[in-house]
């Protein structure tokens, strides 16, 4: 019925093979090191910035959407006492989520996005980061523990400082006042979620 966005996977060729080199079987590679290589992170970020409009249908067809206009108030509401105020708006394109495997990787990508966007003002996106503080490891039954998005007290100091700086960037973009304290962090988490839907 054309009411669902298509799911599309792009495969990008990342390397050529030399026919004159004998291929040798190995047990495995250091995947984490390969995925977190600065050159890889730089190239992936560059690709996303260059193709963001195309992949999210920016500048293409428009549609009418009931946008939430009081996001900060709704995010700060503890008892669902604030009524959502929505307004019909014509919108072009969709928002995007970029998920990575670890907090250190999230930090590297966040910094790389900031660096590349500062170097090329034509490629400005509103980038936020959020991550859980727990060890998102599988339990013996194969099920992941629930993350507790309401508390940052278990974050190591480096991660908390990083998240505090990222939230400060977010506050500057959206004129909000969040931080990593328990109540304000929960509201930041909700605010990011609401803006993604909007």
Show the residue positions of the predicted features:
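Conserved P-loop NTPase motor "coupling/switch" region that bridges the ATPase
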Residues: 1-4, 25-33
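A short acidic, often aromatic-flanked loop/helix-cap motif at beta-alpha or helix-coil junctions
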Residues: 14-18, 135-138
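Surface-exposed beta-strand edges and their flanking turn/coil or helix-capping segments
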Residues: 19-24, 142-145
């Amino acid at each position: 019925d054309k009411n669902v966005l298509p799911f599309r996977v792009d495969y990008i060729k990342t390397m050529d093979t030399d026919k004159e080199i004998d291929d040798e079987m190995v047990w495995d590679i250091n995947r984490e090191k390969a995925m977190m290589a600065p050159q890889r992170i730089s190239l992936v970020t560059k690709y996303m910035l260059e193709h963001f409009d195309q992949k999210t249908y920016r500048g293409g067809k428009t549609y009418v959407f009931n946008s939430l206009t009081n996001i900060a108030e709704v995010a700060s509401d503890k008892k669902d006492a604030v009524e959502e105020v929505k307004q019909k708006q014509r919108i072009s394109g969709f928002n995007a989520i970029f998920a990575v495997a670890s907090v250190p990787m999230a930090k590297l990508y966040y910094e790389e996005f900031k660096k590349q966007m500062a170097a090329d003002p034509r490629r400005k996106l509103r980038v936020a980061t959020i991550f859980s503080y727990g060890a998102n490891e599988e339990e013996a039954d194969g099920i992941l523990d629930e993350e507790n998005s309401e508390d940052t007290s278990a974050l190591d100091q480096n991660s908390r400082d990083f998240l505090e700086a990222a939230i400060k960037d977010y506050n500057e973009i959206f004129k909000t006042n969040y931080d990593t304290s328990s109540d304000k962090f929960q509201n930041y988490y909700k605010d990011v979620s609401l803006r993604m839907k909007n």
